[in-house]
Amino acid sequence: KRQHEILTFSYVAARIMESVFIAVGILAVLAIVTLRHDAGADAASLGGLAESLAAIKDWTFNLGPGFVVGIGNGLILGYLMLRSGLMPRGLALLGVIGGPLQTLAGIGVLFDLYDAGGPVQSIATIPEIIWELSLGIYPLIWGFRSSPIVAEEGRPVLHPAVLAR
């Protein structure tokens, strides 16, 4: 039996939530662009609406990439890679440590303790950045390590039609 199935689904749910936040933010920006080209309405009302849409964009990007990424991509995926042994321990620990740091930095921005993209949030995000870079670069250059979880299950069973080729 594979390990940590609930965490795997939690990771997928976190990535979906992040994507939804980003999509809503992008729709808000597109709505601002549409309002800018709409000449038939009152400029004052359009300005207020554009400011509201810009605030929605700011909040969605603070919640999605600024908060949820630390939980999903950092903490959950880092822990899964640490437990499975697919990535080196040091690299996986960057996700386990960097994820909560990014989440805490995101909480600080949400509660207006410091500015979004400011020095505090930028420094707190560095371990997560290194983790995400290593998650792409390490397997590309050296490949994933063989996992003891997969090794216990043996070789995959192939359908007879595949074997006949």
Language-model features, listed with the residues they occupy:
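Hydrophobic, aromatic-enriched alpha-helical segments typical of multi-pass transmembrane helices
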Residues: 1-165
